[in-house]
Curated annotation (Swiss-Prot):
Cellular compartments annotated: Cytoplasm
Keywords carried by this UniProt record: Acyltransferase, Amino-acid biosynthesis, Cytoplasm, Transferase
Region: Disordered, residue numbers: 1-25
Family annotation (Pfam families): Hexapep, SATase_N
Pathway: Amino-acid biosynthesis; L-cysteine biosynthesis; L-cysteine from L-serine: step 1/2
Catalysed reactions, semicolon-separated: L-serine + acetyl-CoA = O-acetyl-L-serine + CoA
Induction, as annotated: By cadmium (Cd). Not induced under sulfur-deficient conditions.
Similarity comment text for this entry: Belongs to the transferase hexapeptide repeat family.
Protein name: Serine acetyltransferase 5
Organism: Arabidopsis thaliana (Mouse-ear cress)
Gene Ontology biological process terms from the UniProt entry: cysteine biosynthetic process from serine
Class of this enzyme: transferase
Residue ranges, compositional bias (Basic and acidic residues): 1-17
Length: 312
């Protein structure tokens, strides 16, 4: 027995230490498997993109030099998109070589950015009938390009390199007509369809597998400071010209109709339409079925035909 008042020190048992070690090893192994799978997916997609570029170069010789410089001369997706964005966003005083190094270093230092790019490419190819190939999206879809450039500006913002992040944000807005504040948080599997006129405020958050049409504003009310912009859940669909203002929550799998002005929370799998927006359906008559993901199905009008009380 230890003397009264003396604290008794107990060392962790060998069984507990062994359990912790095994748990850590299992997590490390799982992470390694996930990373290897992501690398393999990116490599497979890059092989397909290069095959598409070779096919297009043969079919249209006028594009051969362009396709070689943007895709075929590069060894990876990260290098290709860094080169392409550098040339798209450069100016007489912001050189393409500087931007290329900036983009490539950022993408190379954070594999999650590359993985998000892969998810965004697949989102455009699957959801947009006008997207004829992955290479077409990579080179020509300004919504896709704006998101990839934003991912880099956001990374710079989180590293307290705010002047550079804001300079890049300005170029993105000038070139692509897409205004996303560098502090805004955006998930993966995002489709900005047409993209012109999209505005996303500083404290906005967009989840995964979200589709947003042109002229959408995720803004503030003008009456609040701090956390003042919308939070968009996973799998949402935001129709063309919709305006969502204030620190409101659009629940996972929700839908906002085209031209709506939303000032209220929208529940998960709910639908908001009109100006000012109101909810269609409700808990007793949900407008979105459990098996549907609006951000992926891209069905903009189902709520109109299904609900006779629709008013806009």
């Amino acid at each position: 027995m230890p003397p009264a008042g003396e604290l008794r020190h107990q060392s962790p048992s060998k069984e507990k230490l062994s359990s912790v070690t095994q748990s850590d090893e299992a997590e490390a192994a799982s992470a390694a498997i996930s990373a290897a799978a992501a690398d393999a997916e990116a490599a497979g997609l890059w092989t397909q993109i290069k095959a598409e570029a070779r096919r297009d170069a043969e079919a249209e010789p006028a594009l051969a030099s362009y396709l070689y410089s943007t895709i075929l001369s590069h060894s990876s997706l990260e290098r290709s998109i860094s080169f392409h964005l550098g040339n798209k966003l450069c100016s007489s005083t912001l050189l393409s070589t500087l931007l290329y190094d900036l983009f490539l270093n950022t993408f190379s230092s954070d594999p999650s950015l590359r993985n998000a790019t892969v998810a965004d490419l697949r989102a455009a190819r699957v959801r947009d009938p006008a997207c004829i190939s992955f290479s077409h999206c990579l080179l020509n879809y300004k919504g896709f390009l704006a998101i990839q450039a934003h991912r880099v500006s956001h990374k710079l913002w989180t590293q307290s390199r705010k002047p550079l992040a804001l300079a890049l944000h300005s170029r993105i807005s000038d070139v692509f007509a897409v205004d996303i504040h560098p502090a805004a948080k955006i998930g993966k599997g995002i489709l900005l369809d047409h993209a012109t006129g999209v505005v996303v405020g500083e404290t906005a958050v967009i989840g995964n597998n979200v589709s947003i049409l042109h002229h959408v504003t995720l803004g503030g009310t003008g009456k609040a400071c701090g956390d003042r912009h919308p939070k968009i859940g996973d799998g949402c669909l935001i129709g063309a010209g919709a305006t969502i203002l204030g620190n409101v929550k659009i629940g996972a799998g929700a839908k906002v109709g085209a031209g709506s002005v939303v000032l209220i929370d929208v529940p998960c799998r709910g639908t908001a339409v009109g100006n000012p927006a109101r909810l269609v359906g409700g808990k007793e008559k949900p407008t979105i079925h459990d098996e549907e993901c609006p951000g992926e199905s891209m069905d903009h009008t189902s709520f109109i035909s299904e609900w006779s009380d629709y008013i806009i």
